[in-house]
Amino acid sequence: MRIFRFTSISPRILPSNHYSTFPLKQNVSSLSPAKYIAGALQEHINSPAPKAGKKIHADIIKTGFQPDLNISIKLLILHLKCGCLSYARQVFDELPKPTLSAYNYMISGYLKHGLVKELLLLVQRMSYSGEKADGYTLSMVLKASNSRGSTMILPRSLCRLVHARIIKCDVELDDVLITALVDTYVKSGKLESARTVFETMKDENVVCCTSMISGYMNQGFVEDAEEIFNTTKVKDIVVYNAMVEGFSRSGETAKRSVDMYISMQRAGFHPNISTFASVIGACSVLTSHEVGQQVHAQIMKSGVYTHIKMGSSLLDMYAKCGGINDARRVFDQMQEKNVFSWTSMIDGYGKNGNPEEALELFTRMKEFRIEPNYVTFLGALSACSHSGLVDKGYEIFESMQRDYSMKPKMEHYACIVDLMGRAGDLNKAFEFARAMPERPDSDIWAALLSSCNLHGNVELASIAASELFKLNADKRPGAYLALSNVYASNDKWDNVSKIREVMKRRRISKTIGRSWTSED
């Protein structure tokens, strides 16, 4: 269906006084119909409620008015602002020869709604038509490649292809295009390429600086991130947040996250939700209950305390610092809770030796019609394991697929093996592992071996260890020690000697004080 035609008919004066406030501001008699319509459309485009402007389009169709290019572009913009992509595309397709601006408006509309496939097809059509893409067009292609909502699999080399097109077509590298290039290279893990583009900036760009800092921090290049931060002349809250968040991820640098948090306030910047969430994460890594309480007090004064992200971060921090009562107090005071809040509290109870409270909360969660996620089930199953509730744990495991259509992952199977094994049902745990729909991974056999070590079952320990060593013999040094302990507890000293000889030959040593399930 054609919305309007670009055929030659005499324009009729539009009999409308409801288009906008435009007629009240202009002497309508002095305007041509085209200027009148263009002005009315612009009024609606600029208004917070642009949908009323669609009446103008309806009148254009009814009267047979021939819109010029200016009106057509404004109709395109109007429909995009209203979120009506199909109408916008119809207007676009009616253009005899779409201009660069028309292409860019339509492409930006697709980008805004996450329609990456449609965006790329339109860019392809643009190229075939002979219309040259400008920096803005290419920046939108780059942004589309970073779109999280897209299900389309894009080539990893897309950024390099766009970059090559920029160079080949001699497109000017303005701030928008440089920012898009740097951000895309960073998100694809190509930091050297990102840095090369970053160095071409004539003027400092705080957005690019932040992208580079985040990219370096994500890959553990802390010194490079610091270099960018220190050479950034005009810093803002976002740059500081990138440093606070980056430092917070590792136990080696978490203390520096707190230091940066203090420094930014001395520099005159007030923490926002992102800042608080990152520094709370640092307190969790440091298990620093005291510092966490101080940050909590500041959050209370800041006005962001009621935000659901703050509540979830705080209760998770308190739980990891061993302050489970403080965590529960935060949980109870939260005005709004989501699945992450409930999961953090359940997991916190389980890890702090309160399995009964964890399971009670898991039951209450369902009463509030909050659907558990995979991590929630892990917390509940772990609580059952520590309480010895085999039947309850298996019921929860079965409910994953039965009630929530969630296919259990390896971690959930490992929890059940651990649950049965801890309770002494070693044969049942072994049969459960063998009956799994997928091949058991190393965590499954490690859980069974741990239980065999606990109960001194030599036969199953040998089987579990054998399967475990087939998968990653050198990455489970504690497994050798566990098997050796089982043999020793059953006076099988020859086997103990053989195990130690294998460890010596493979240069495998057990680090004192680490869990046997940990990986080097």
From Swiss-Prot:
Presequence positions on this chain: 1-19
CC per GO annotation: mitochondrion
GO molecular-function term, one example from the UniProt record: RNA binding
InterPro entries in UniProt: E_motif, Pentatricopeptide_rpt, PPR_At4g14850-like_plant, TPR-like_helical_dom_sf
Main location: mitochondrion
Subcellular location as annotated: Mitochondrion
Pfam families according to UniProt: E_motif, PPR, PPR_2
NCBIfam families referenced in this protein's UniProt entry, alphabetically: PPR (TIGR00756)
Name of the featured protein: Pentatricopeptide repeat-containing protein At1g28690, mitochondrial
Organism from which the protein derives: Arabidopsis thaliana (Mouse-ear cress)
